[in-house]
C-alpha cells in the first residue's frame, strides 16, 4: 500500500496542479468520517475490514502500559490531523496505537486567514499557520458522547488543549481550565499546548510564571487523575526546558511531549514559497517534518537525562521511517507521534514503522519496546 501511495497518489497530490493542502486534508477526513458513521453498511464494513488488513500490524512486543493505559503499539496520530474528532473511530483501523485529537480551545474559532497550510516537498516538511481552527471544546465533548467510542476494544485518545485567541494571556489558566472541565471525562490523557507559534503570545506561556498558573489549576479539577502532559517547542534553550521540567515535577504532571513545530528556517532547501511567491523566511507559521528530526530527538534525550528516565516522554517531529522512530525511542520517548510523515507517505507508514521496530528489537536482543526506551542513554 505504501508503494501504491508513493507511485500513484503522491505524484497526483504533489503535482503542479495539486489541490490546496487544507482542502485535500478535509477530503480525507470527510471520507474517513463517512466510513466511521456508516457502520451499518455492508460495503462500509467491508472497507473497514480491508483497511485493517492493509494497515494494522500487531505484536505483543510492541505493547506498553503507561499511566495505567494500554497502548497496543507506540505509534500515535499527532494533534492537528483530526482537530474535532471528525474521524474519531477510524484511527485504530489505520494501525495507530493511540490518537491525539485537537488542538481544541474553549471558544470555537476559525483560525488564521487562508491559505495557511503549505507543503515543502524539497524539505519533506509542512508549513502551517492554522491558528487553532476548531469547533470548540463543547463540540468535541459532544462528539465523544455521540460516538461513544464505537470500537469494541480499548483505544487511548489524547485531547490537546490550547488557549482561545480571544482570551487575554493573563486569563489563560481559566481558559485551559474551562476546556478541561468540558472534556475531562472524554479523553484518556490531556495535553497543555503552550508551544504553537500560530497564536499570538502563546509561547510566552512556556515561561515558568505563566505555566505554573495553568498547572496549578488543572489538577484540582482532575478528580479521575487523568494523565496531564505539557507540550514544548523545539526552539527552547536547554535551560528553559530544565525549568519546565522542574515545574512538571513540582505539580506532579504526568509527562512531556517533545516537540511542537519550529519557527527556525535556517536549514530549509525551500527559499521561496511557491504558493505565495514570498521568501520562506518572511512566511509566518511553524515547520514540521524532516527539518525537525534531529532537534526533537536531541530534546528528548536531554529530558530523559535530566529526569533520569523517570518522566514519560511522547516524541514527535520528523518521523518518516522505523529508524527515525527507533532513534526517538532509544533517546527516551516511550511513545511517538506522526503527522507530516503520514502526509508524505500515506497510511502504510504506521505498519512500516512497526515492522521495522520489531526488527530493531530482534537485532538488539530485546523482548519488548519498553526495553528500548532510553537505550541510547544507558
Swiss-Prot record:
Major enzyme class: oxidoreductase
Main location: membrane
EC identifiers of the protein: 1.3.5.2
InterPro entries to which the protein is assigned, alphabetical: Aldolase_TIM, DHO_dehydrogenase, Dihydroorotate_DH_2, Dihydroorotate_DH_cat, Dihydroorotate_DH_CS
Cofactor binding: number and manner: Binds 1 FMN per subunit.
Necessary cofactors: FMN
Reactions it catalyzes: (S)-dihydroorotate + a quinone = orotate + a quinol
Active site annotation, chain numbering: 196
Molecular function, one GO term: dihydroorotate dehydrogenase (quinone) activity
Membrane topology label: Peripheral membrane protein
Pfam family, one: DHO_dh
Keywords: Cell membrane, Flavoprotein, FMN, Membrane, Oxidoreductase, Pyrimidine biosynthesis
Any one Gene Ontology BP term: 'de novo' pyrimidine nucleobase biosynthetic process
GO CC list: cytoplasm; plasma membrane
Pathways involved: Pyrimidine metabolism; UMP biosynthesis via de novo pathway; orotate from (S)-dihydroorotate (quinone route): step 1/1
Chain sites annotated for binding substrate: 83, 128-132, 193, 198, 260-261
Assigned protein family: Belongs to the dihydroorotate dehydrogenase family. Type 2 subfamily.
Self-association and partners: Monomer.
Task of the protein: Catalyzes the conversion of dihydroorotate to orotate with quinone as electron acceptor.
PANTHER family, alphabetized: DIHYDROOROTATE DEHYDROGENASE (QUINONE), MITOCHONDRIAL, DIHYDROOROTATE DEHYDROGENASE (QUINONE), MITOCHONDRIAL-RELATED
Protein's recorded name: Dihydroorotate dehydrogenase (quinone)
Amino acid at each position: 500500500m505504501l508503494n501504491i501511495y508513493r507511485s500513484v497518489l503522491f505524484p497526483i497530490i504533489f503535482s503542479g496542479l495539486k489541490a490546496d493542502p487544507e482542502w485535500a486534508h478535509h477530503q480525507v477526513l470527510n471520507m474517513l468520517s463517512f466510513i466511521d458513521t456508516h457502520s451499518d453498511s455492508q460495503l462500509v464494513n467491508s472497507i473497514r475490514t480491508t483497511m485493517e488488513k492493509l494497515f494494522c500490524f500487531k505484536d505483543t512486543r510492541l505493547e506498553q502500559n503507561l499511566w495505567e493505559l494500554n497502548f497496543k503499539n507506540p505509534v500515535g496520530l499527532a494533534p492537528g490531523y483530526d482537530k474535532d474528532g471528525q474521524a474519531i473511530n477510524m484511527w485504530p483501523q489505520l494501525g495507530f496505537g493511540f490518537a491525539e485529537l485537537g488542538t481544541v480551545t474553549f471558544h470555537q474559532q476559525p483560525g488564521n486567514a487562508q491559505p495557511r497550510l503549505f507543503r515543502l516537498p524539497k524539505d519533506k516538511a509542512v508549513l502551517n499557520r492554522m491558528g487553532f481552527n476548531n469547533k470548540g471544546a463543547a463540540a468535541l465533548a459532544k462528539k465523544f458522547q455521540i460516538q461513544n467510542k464505537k470500537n469494541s476494544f480499548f483505544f487511548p485518545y489524547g485531547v490537546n488543549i490550547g488557549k482561545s485567541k480571544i482570551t487575554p494571556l493573563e486569563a489563560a489558566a481559566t481558559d485551559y481550565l474551562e476546556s478541561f472541565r468540558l472534556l475531562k471525562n472524554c479523553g484518556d490523557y490531556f495535553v497543555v499546548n503552550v508551544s504553537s507559534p500560530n497564536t499570538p503570545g502563546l509561547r510566552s506561556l512556556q515561561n515558568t510564571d505563566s505555566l505554573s498558573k495553568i498547572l496549578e489549576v488543572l489538577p484540582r479539577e482532575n478528580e479521575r487523575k487523568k494523565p496531564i502532559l505539557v507540550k514544548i517547542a523545539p526552539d527552547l534553550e536547554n535551560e528553559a526546558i530544565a525549568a519546565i521540567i522542574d515545574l512538571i515535577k513540582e505539580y506532579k504532571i504526568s509527562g512531556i511531549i517533545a516537540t511542537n513545530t519550529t519557527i527556525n528556517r535556517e536549514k530549509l532547501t525551500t527559499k521561496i514559497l511557491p504558493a505565495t511567491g514570498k521568501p520562506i523566511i518572511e512566511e509566518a507559521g511553524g515547520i514540521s517534518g524532516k527539518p525537525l528530526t534531529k532537534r526533537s530527538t536531541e530534546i528528548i534525550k536531554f529530558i530523559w537525562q535530566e529526569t533520569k528516565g523517570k518522566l514519560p516522554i511522547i516524541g514527535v517531529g520528523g518521523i518518516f521511517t522505523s529508524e527515525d522512530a527507533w532513534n526517538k525511542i532509544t533517546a527516551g520517548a516511550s511513545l511517538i507521534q506522526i503527522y507530516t510523515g503520514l502526509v508524505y507517505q500515506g497510511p502504510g507508514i504506521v505498519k512500516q514503522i512497526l515492522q521495522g521496530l520489531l526488527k530493531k528489537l530482534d537485532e538488539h536482543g530485546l523482548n519488548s519496546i519498553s526495553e528500548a526506551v532510553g537505550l541510547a542513554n544507558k
